[in-house]
Amino acid sequence: MPIRLSKEKINDLLQRSQGDLTSSQDEIVHYTDVFIAGSGPIACTYARHIIDNTSTTKVYMAEIGSQDNPVIGAHHRNSIKFQKDTDKFVNIINGALQPISISPSDTYQPTLAVAAWAPPIDPAEGQLVIMGHNPNQEAGLNLPGSAVTRTVGGMATHWTCACPTPHDEERVNNPVDKQEFDALLERAKTLLNVHSDQYDDSIRQIVVKETLQQTLDASRGVTTLPLGVERRTDNPIYVTWTGADTVLGDVPKSPRFVLVTETRVTKFIVSETNPTQVVAALLRNLNTSNDELVVAQSFVIACGAVCTPQILWNSNIRPHALGRYLSEQSMTFCQIVLKRSIVDSIATDPRFAAKVEAHKKKHPDDVLPIPFHEPEPQVMIPYTSDFPWHVQVHRYAFGDVGPKADPRVVVDLRFFGKSDIVEENRVTFGPNPKLRDWEAGVTDTYGMPQPTFHVKRTNADGDRDQRMMNDMTNVANILGGYLPGSYPQFMAPGLAQHITGTTRIGTDDQTSVADPTSKVHNFDNLWVGGNGCIPDATACNPTRTSVAYALKGAEAVVSYLGVS
């Protein structure tokens, strides 16, 4: 059962935390039933389930970033300007992604004027310290593409919304009963508003999917990519992409729900008399630099696969598996221009006659038979045992088409490969900082312990990656020719933003951080959420899987509180 703190205990708690609380300010104490760190789709899954399934339970949610949309947690791509010009959305994504660990770089510039200041060439004379860089990060072990999005809604403000069902080989370590987890995945599908039919009427969708279905073996299972998206009924040219707001529903209207922004969750405070209980969360208001305390009965951390273990580490909650068993997907990418034969077939296909005729009537000089507002393709080639990678054939923000190619005939190919699970693949954190400011190798720019990656791909990973690249070039050649400047390439490690395993769930407290309900081992009232909870190597997008785990975790929170 949850413990309840008296005023005397609260005062004692404040006094014991005095070393962390801002001494020159009056401490602020907030009281709630459930405290949630983070505001992405996983945090919102917890909030939604708890509010919907209780009558009096209060939820207090803290987000380190700001609210950048008038709608709490909305997907930025719902903006008309980005639906009209997808390629411009890349600037939003790049602006939202903050690198996690930047390894030192060679600062020698041979063409710099001698009169200009430059750091010493001899390291013995001192080294340049660049704010935000991590001197402890070995470049060869880094995930340089890995980043954090600090905003209300998290990465769901700019994600692709792909929500495939994981293959059985992507859930071999799942401690949840298969039948139960299948049901959780279906519930996650509903919560994320996943559809597989919103692009069925698109000319490009039809011709790309049919070309692949007719050319590849049927065992590849070419199909429509399941997406968290719904076409608008008032104007079908546009769609509504799923964001954290979709998951949250009407929760923001509830007087039992509080969201604070630009507030860092510094650490959790464990009871001195009962080490299985967290009694409070220490927060830092980043606008005022004042510290605050949230006293609750249950606590949930859902701040991403790196920031969640970061907070646990800073709280001196350090299970052996914390940050270990890190798995990240490899990624290959290219863009193609559709074959002339595919494009020419559109003009003569009776299924498209009405659309083509209307387009030609309106734009008689256009040599392409594809209407300007025709939706992009959204095709998936799912993971199979023979081809253990996940494939998306579509058009998204990354990849600059440029002025010489019409985006209507450009298609992106993204292949995602899994990695072997290795305990030594991990993220570690700097020592507990005494000062809440940036310190090279000690803290990140938000004053939390600096993450450092130690990740290698195995030889087996390399073999799979090579096969995956070969498969991508084969698929590309089926569809068309490479767009100049966007040839087949491996993307920077970490760019997939699909890290798993850092707070993995399981039954053994030595090889996992939390139990099958995502409750941290040896704690009664502390839960974790997010892709880090996934104990498997995955190739498909992990969000739907993480939401499924979060639904089970939220049920456990409600059960723990003993409310209905």
Swiss-Prot record:
Temperature-related behavior of activity: Optimum temperature is 50 degrees Celsius. Active from 30 to 65 degrees Celsius. Thermostable for 30 minutes up to 55 degrees Celsius.
Name used for this protein in its record: Pyranose 2-oxidase
Family: Belongs to the GMC oxidoreductase family.
UniProt-listed Enzyme Commission number(s): 1.1.3.10
pH curve summary: Optimum pH is 7.5-8.0. Active from pH 6 to 10. Stable from pH 5 to 11.
Lineage summary: Eukaryota, Fungi, Dikarya, Basidiomycota, Agaricomycotina
Reaction it catalyzes: D-glucose + O2 = 2-dehydro-D-glucose + H2O2
Prosequence residues removed at maturation: 1-25
Keywords associated with the record: FAD, Flavoprotein, Oxidoreductase
Subunit organization: Homotetramer.
Binding sites annotated in the UniProt record for substrate: Q392, H394
Residues at the active site: H498 (proton acceptor), N541
Function: Catalyzes the oxidation of various aldopyranoses and disaccharides on carbon-2 to the corresponding 2-keto sugars concomitant with the reduction of O(2) to H(2)O(2). The preferred substrate is D-glucose which is converted to 2-dehydro-D-glucose. Acts also on D-xylose, L-sorbose, D-galactose and 1,5-anhydroglucitol, a diagnostic marker of diabetes mellitus.
GO molecular function, one term: pyranose oxidase activity
Cofactor: binding comment: Binds 1 FAD covalently per subunit.
Cofactor(s) the protein needs: FAD
Modified residue annotations for Tele-8alpha-FAD histidine: H158
Domain of life per record: Eukaryota
